[in-house]
Each structure stands twice: as structure tokens, then as C-alpha cells.
């Protein structure tokens, strides 16, 4: 049986070494997020201030995998 994961939205607050980021979730929790392999392969840039979707394990809610970067509505790209 596959492990159940929670998907949250949050804001990148800090960039750390090795593709790690500090993420503030919408429920005000701070967790450590790492970039998923699909985002890494696609060369998607994630910077502080970006909104992301993050997948969090039920067993360790202090870490999560960033699975999607939400586009900003005010950018021209």
C-alpha cells in the first residue's frame, strides 16, 4: 500500500544549500522543503517569494517535497 501524503500550499521564505528551502505553509507552520526530481530535471527556478505546492509525509511533518511552483498572476511570462 502506498504511503498517504498531505499536499499543502506555501511560500518560500529562504533558500538553503543543495536545493533545500524553508517554506511557510498557509497554516503558518514552517517546514523544510526539497525540490522533486521532476522539477530539478525541468530546470524550474524556485526563488524566495514563490508560492509552491508541497507534499508532506504523514509520519514526518517537518520535511516535504516541492512538487509544483505556482505561477505569479502579475508576471508577464
From Swiss-Prot:
HAMAP family: IF_1. NCBIfam families: infA. The lineage of its organism: Eukaryota, Viridiplantae, Streptophyta, Embryophyta, Tracheophyta. This is Translation initiation factor IF-1, chloroplastic. InterPro entries: NA-bd_OB-fold, RNA-binding_domain_S1_IF1, S1_domain, TIF_IF1. Pfam families: eIF-1a. The keyword rRNA-binding applies. Residues 1-71 form the S1-like domain. Belongs to the IF-1 family. GO terms for molecular function: ribosome binding; rRNA binding; translation initiation factor activity. One of its GO terms (cellular component) is cytosol. Keywords: Chloroplast, Initiation factor, Plastid, Protein biosynthesis, RNA-binding, rRNA-binding. It is found in: Plastid, Chloroplast. One of the essential components for the initiation of protein synthesis. Stabilizes the binding of IF-2 and IF-3 on the 30S subunit to which N-formylmethionyl-tRNA(fMet) subsequently binds. Helps modulate mRNA selection, yielding the 30S pre-initiation complex (PIC). Upon addition of the 50S ribosomal subunit IF-1, IF-2 and IF-3 are released leaving the mature 70S translation initiation complex. Component of the 30S ribosomal translation pre-initiation complex which assembles on the 30S ribosome in the order IF-2 and IF-3, IF-1 and N-formylmethionyl-tRNA(fMet); mRNA recruitment can occur at any time during PIC assembly.
